[in-house]
Amino acid sequence: MIINISNKEDFQTLLKSEKPILLDFYADWCGPCKALLPIVEKLADKHKDDFAIAKINVDNNGELAQEFGVRSIPALFFLKDGKIQ
């Protein structure tokens, strides 16, 4: 399952999860982000018990994107115990 992060509070709640997290920073208008989506969806299906996948729209969550140093999209980060791996 893919979790859509709407705000920083959603993100903080997600960080409390014991599972590692794959963060996918994207934008609705981004062609490469759209091309990556089927791959992310397959990962979500195949590894649903191993890690969570969260999508973060940079247009709606600029502060989070800035915290992660996102300069271009798509941008993927893998977190374990709240830290980038």
Task: Give the positions of each predicted feature.
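Proteins that catalyze or organize thiol-disulfide redox chemistry
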Residues: M1-A52, D59-Q85
